[in-house]
UniProtKB/Swiss-Prot annotation:
Transmembrane domains' residue ranges: none
Taxonomy of the source species: Bacteria, Pseudomonadati, Pseudomonadota, Betaproteobacteria, Nitrosomonadales
Gene3D superfamilies named in the record: Ribosomal Protein S4 Delta 41, Chain A, domain 1, RNA-binding S4 domain
Protein name: Small ribosomal subunit protein uS4B
Top-rank taxon, per record: Bacteria
Role: One of the primary rRNA binding proteins, it binds directly to 16S rRNA where it nucleates assembly of the body of the 30S subunit. With S5 and S12 plays an important role in translational accuracy.
Encoding gene (name): rpsD2
Length: 205
């Protein structure tokens, strides 16, 4: 399954949750699923599979991943000695495109990925163009000086979509973000039952 390119608010309404990495819009004004029978769908109890699928889709869409990419991260998480769900969330939060987003350089993860792909981002002082790079404690990101004047960067820095997480130390003068410790499940900026995601993949790998 490829990355979805349709209306982002429609996705969030279907999942019943705001996904800050996907869109700055909110479902507050239209909380029911899209479609003629949206209100009835809210009242209908989801099956166990439906719940697992919904939680998995939250991760896919917030972090802008294809099914193949998320499955690959789950495989890596299962190799860890730490709880699989916690490890999966940590791997997602440590992706370069997400860190660029959480630092406040872009309004969404998708926009952050574009900045990385076009080499506007520096990692430890060097230009990079691979959004999936996994950052570690001590890594530092910034935007090239000439790219700080891009409207999307300027606008986001002036109106942050989210508060910066505690694991990312921000230097306002130099416009840099440094990872001081690894993210935890509590740092994920939307409600997620990651154990449901683990169970979804349990018999699919």
């Amino acid at each position: 399954m490829s990355r979805f390119t349709g209306p982002r608010l429609k996705i969030m309404r279907a999942l019943g949750v705001d996904l800050p990495g996907l869109s700055r819009k909110t479902i507050a004004s239209r909380p029911t699923p899209p479609g003629q029978h949206g209100a009835k769908l809210v009242r209908r109890r989801k099956s166990d599979f439906g719940i697992k699928l919904q939680e998995k889709q939250k991760l896919r869409f917030n972090y802008g991943l294809s099914e193949r990419q998320l499955r690959h991260l789950m495989l890596n998480a299962r190799k860890s000695t730490e709880p699989t769900g916690e490890t999966l969330l940590q791997l997602l939060e440590r992706r370069l495109d997400n860190v660029v987003f959480r630092a406040g350089f872009a309004p969404t993860v998708i926009a952050a990925r574009q900045l990385v792909s076009h080499r506007h981002v520096r990692l430890n002082g060097k230009p990079v163009n691979i959004p999936s790079i996994r950052l570690n404690v001590g890594d530092e990101i910034t935007i090239k000086p000439e790219s700080l004047n891009l409207p999307i960067v300027l606008g986001t820095l002036q109106d942050l979509p989210l508060s910066r997480p505690e694991w990312l130390l921000w230097d306002e003068k130099d416009k840099t973000g440094k990872i001081t410790h690894l993210p935890t499940a509590e740092d994920v900026p939307f409600p997620i039952d990651v154990q449901q995601v683990v169970e979804y993949y349990a018999n699919r790998m």
